Amino acid sequence: MTKSIIVALDEYDQIKFDNVLDQLDPNLCMVKVGSVSFNSLGRESVLKAARKGFDIFLDLKLHDIPNTVKKSVEGLKNLPIKMMTVHTSGGQKMLEESVAAIIDTDIKIFGVTALTSLSNSDTNYIYKRQAEEQVMAMIELATKSNIHGVVCSPQELSLVKNNSNLLTITPGIRLKSLDDDQARVMTPKQAIDNGSDFLVIGRPITCLLYTSPSPRD
């Protein structure tokens, strides 16, 4: 997995999903299939991307009791995916069960720390601590549970890199300041400079597909 850009395919409409996929190059990027596409278009959304040669990040953010997550991962691991997500806050046992379920594959498990849509006021209300404190607690839990990496905002990359050997996936990548639902963001260059292994970029790329001949521009 040498490609560091992951383009988010967050489309529930088959025509729009295909349109985005057709304009991307599997030699330049991976693709993320999340709950929007997977829940509406099913496993075929993953299989179609795989047939076009893409490495796939399945981002379903599984979060349930340990046995349920283990069975869910077992049911998904036969898909042609490279990485998948669970919620780190599901606890050590849940994380360990997810790793055990893919032990005979090359799939990597990433734990979501704190959603990039959450501001400090949100994390204070939900977790009774600042976003960085919540992420640090999840880094420690991820390390203890032997998962492969974490999903964090680019603003917390230094916390991960200075306190663990975990791989990092960073959503919240913006080319400029936008009035949208992301709270903790950075530009691609800032995220790379801070050590991100994989950058998830959705709307900044997919919105260009309707105004530019090619997103590679």
Where are these regions (language model features)?
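Hydrophobic faces of well-ordered beta-strands that scaffold small-molecule active sites
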Residues: 5-8, 31-33, 56-60, 84-86, ...
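Active-site beta-loop-alpha junctions enriched in small/polar residues
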Residues: 8-12, 34-38, 63-65, 89, ...
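Conserved anion-binding
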Residues: 68-72, 81-145
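Alpha/beta enzyme core
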Residues: 20, 26, 78, 127-149, ...
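Active-site-adjacent beta->alpha loops and helix N-cap segments on the catalytic face
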Residues: 37-49, 65-71, 88-103, 154-166, ...
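Glycine-rich phosphate-binding active-site loops on the catalytic face of alpha/beta enzymes
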Residues: 86-90, 194-209
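Active-site-adjacent loop and "lid" segments of alpha/beta metabolic enzymes
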Residues: 111-135, 159-194, 198
